[in-house]
Amino acid sequence: MISAGDLRKGVTFEFDGQVFTVTDFLHVKPGKGAAFVRTKLRNVISGGVVDRTFNPTEKLQEAVIERKEMQYLYSDGELYYFMDQETFEQIPLNAEKVEDAIKYLKENMFAVIKFFKGSAFSVEAPNFVELQITYTEPGVKGNTATNSLKPATVETGAIINVPMFVNDGDVIRIDTRTGEYMERV
């Protein structure tokens, strides 16, 4: 059992006979009245999103989730294909299940696929990835006195804010949990 006050982004639990993953949460302590937890939940089976408010002391049944590392192979436009390294079985997943992880995945990279009762419902990119910058505006000399950032497009198409000294062709490390630039490699 997990209490509603412990809900965080990515936690999966069973509620009202359905399984939900927390996509967003806010713990609210109003000046008057009791505290509550406002959440945005995604149904792992249907993909539907609901807003739900919980009392922080409310107990929820934690769902049993299987996590399996798989290799991202390719995309055919609508579906993304992942391969199990043990059985070599390929699993197609739609964009709704892949979510934001695809912004950081190149072909042949490994990602964690989450399963509930044998059905894949979510993809988790590695915490840190190294990607090459394909386009960014050149930094102007003298612009580096402050900690200013500029947008840069990486090889997967994601746009990341990077420091002024980063140029086209540089390889950078990105924290996929926050989408932030970490360092130049």
From Swiss-Prot:
Query: So which domain of life are we looking at?
Result: Bacteria
Q: Which GO terms describe its cellular component?
A: cytoplasm
Concerning NCBIfam families, the annotation shows:
efp, PRK00529.1
Looking up InterPro entries in the UniProt record yields: Elong-fact-P_C, NA-bd_OB-fold, Rib_uL2_dom2, Transl_elong_fac_P/YeiP, Transl_elong_KOW-like, Transl_elong_P/YeiP_cen, Transl_elong_P/YeiP_CS, Transl_elongation_fac_P
GO MF terms, alphabetically ordered: translation elongation factor activity
What coarse category fits the chief subcellular location reported for this protein? cytoplasm
- Give a short account of what the protein does: Involved in peptide bond synthesis. Stimulates efficient translation and peptide-bond synthesis on native or reconstituted 70S ribosomes in vitro. Probably functions indirectly by altering the affinity of the ribosome for aminoacyl-tRNA, thus increasing their reactivity as acceptors for peptidyl transferase.
Protein name from the UniProt record = Elongation factor P
The family annotation for this protein states: Belongs to the elongation factor P family.
